[in-house]
Amino acid sequence: MFEITLVTPDFAIGPQPAAKDFTAIREAGYAAVINVRPDDENGKYLKSADARALAEDQGLTYAFSPSDNHALFEIDIIDQFERALIELPKPIFAHCKSGTRAAILWALVASRHREPKDAIADLRAAGQKIGFLEDELRESAAEVRGSPLRLKDDALLSLGRSKLLGNGQRN
């Protein structure tokens, strides 16, 4: 069984899917896939073009937003991931090799819109442990506050920001 970890009602993370796993992603109700794993990363896995074809064969919208571990905190990388979160149909499944980079990128985006500790709490509730990055999340968010992308981002609000990014409340 393919592992999918729900972070919010509209966003989940997981490891690199194999070809057969795109059916499981669709059957789990996901509408889109974000691939964070670069094509030149070591290991045996699907290249982005192959993953896109498999996703589209299942009726899934596909986005390629590659980042290696060293580029996670670059503003362009975070902006690209945020655009995918805004533009893709929901719910979204995001992956890298293990799901950790996808989780960190989600937290970086969420921290632009709410307190980093709340994003960390959502990930902790989903079984992810990235609390050690709270200072980095806060610093990254401070770099973009007030930027044109943040100020004109009505699309993020209209898609239900609280559902995608979490509202910081635990049930």
What is each PLM-predicted segment?
Residues 1-92, 104-171:
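Cys-dependent protein tyrosine phosphatase-like superfamily
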Residues 96:
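Short cysteine clusters
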